[in-house]
Regions:
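Serine residues within intrinsically disordered or low-complexity segments
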Residues: 5-6, 20, 45
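Residue-level detector of structural "landmarks"
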Residues: 11-13, 32
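AAA+ P-loop NTPase catalytic core and its hallmark functional loops
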Residues: 45-286, 294
Length: 374
């Protein structure tokens, strides 16, 4: 795990590229459909699956618009469909990871984003797709996703008043035939039987064979495949990610690009917090956010040194800041956002980190505990 340097003296630093605000494409009158269903306006334009079958990218965006120093133009869609993620105007991109994802969209590369929890791996792919107006479907490969879920199955349906057996496509053949960016979340938690179904489509022009249908599906030219994972397929030596599995290295070899997205620089993390929690976008609020990020860095360094068994992710820091804005109490928000999840024996250490950064003793700290005993 890479860390920022500090007085603790037991971590290496990791630099992140500069943060960038990405201009969104004009979307005309059509907006992405809300989660509750499809709006009439979207349905009238291009929201149905059948219309997606013929949809192709019809414009391009320069990679430099994403803050990436590369001479690359990325295919994009001029209009949105219901499958396009919502744009987060406050999102900050990591240049290296963004470049890898853009290459996946532009050159049909299979891209895996690996990193620790809460670093924004899935959101990174979603926000690039959102700005390209590229339809995206996200599948969480938990232990209950089966081969039938992905490939499909025979189902009994009513036709002309009669019960007949009909094959219902799973999500994989449905997506392969359309201009969909398919994102497999928690890729290293997938069951082996499911992973081998995915293996064939990992090749750039890999055709999907449906044995039950005696049918071979040719991928849509704009079909793209991405994945996120906490590990690199060699198991979990940290003990943080129970449920992950070693991955077949023959399958890992089929991923064209593997990029790492781990913890960010302190300045980058503070910028993300300011964008996510506008209430702290003041001089005093900035000082509070700086202290929050320092606490998070100390937990990461403590993990590397073996003092802690858990770390504070960027997602947790955002949650802490949001809860602090809700309750108006930074210490209480810290307790309910992170401290209560720590091992009882490790809470005094975490409370000490908090005291170093905020100059305030928590009830869990060693000093406060000793004072109460006296």
């Amino acid at each position: 795990m890479q860390k920022h340097s500090s007085g603790a003296g037991c971590a290496a630093g990791q630099t992140a590229g500069r943060a960038s605000r990405i201009p969104t494409m004009p979307t005309g009158r059509v907006r992405a459909a809300p989660a509750r269903g499809i709006t009439t306006e979207t349905r009238a334009s291009m929201s149905t699956a059948d219309e997606l079958l013929t949809l192709k990218p019809d414009t391009t965006i320069a990679a430099r618009a994403f803050g990436v120093a590369a001479e690359m133009r990325v295919p994009a869609f001029s209009r949105r469909s219901e499958y396009v993620p919502e744009v987060d105007e406050g999102y900050r991109f990591n240049p290296e990871t963004t470049l890898a994802i853009l290459a996946g969209f532009a050159f049909n590369r299979r891209v895996m984003v690996q990193g620790y929890h809460g670093t924004g791996k899935s959101t990174h792919v979603e926000q690039v797709a959102a700005r390209l107006n590229w339809p995206l479907v996200r599948i969480n490969l938990d232990g209950h996703v089966s081969r039938i879920d992905l490939v499909g199955k025979d189902a009994i349906v009513l036709k002309d008043g009669q019960q007949v057996t009909e094959f219902r496509e799973g999500l994989l053949p449905w997506a392969v035939q359309r201009p969909i960016a398919l994102l497999f979340d928690e890729y290293d938690a997938g069951r082996p039987a499911v992973m081998f179904v995915i293996q064939r489509v990992l090749e750039a022009h890999g055709k999907l064979t449906l044995l039950d249908q005696n049918r071979v599906i040719v991928p849509h030219p704009a079909f793209r495949l991405f994945a996120t994972a906490n590990t690199l397929g060699f198991g979990d030596p940290t003990g943080l990610y129970h449920g992950t599995q070693p991955l077949n290295q023959g399958q890992m070899d089929r991923w064209n690009i593997v990029t790492n997205l781990n913890y960010l620089s302190a300045a980058h993390e503070v910028e993300i917090l300011r964008a996510r929690v506008p209430a702290y976008d003041t001089e005093q609020g900035r000082a509070t956010l700086d202290a929050m990020v320092r606490v998070a860095d100390l937990t990461r360094e403590g993990f590397v040194c073996g003092d802690l068994s858990t770390v504070m992710s960027p997602r947790t820091v955002i949650t802490w800041a949001q809860n602090a804005a809700i309750f108006g109490n930074v210490a209480f928000a810290f307790r309910i956002s992170f401290l209560n999840r720590c091992d009882l024996l490790e809470r005094p250490i975490v409370a000490e980190y908090y005291q170093r950064c905020f100059g305030e003793e928590l009830a869990e700290s060693v000093v406060a505990t000793e004072a109460n005993r006296q």
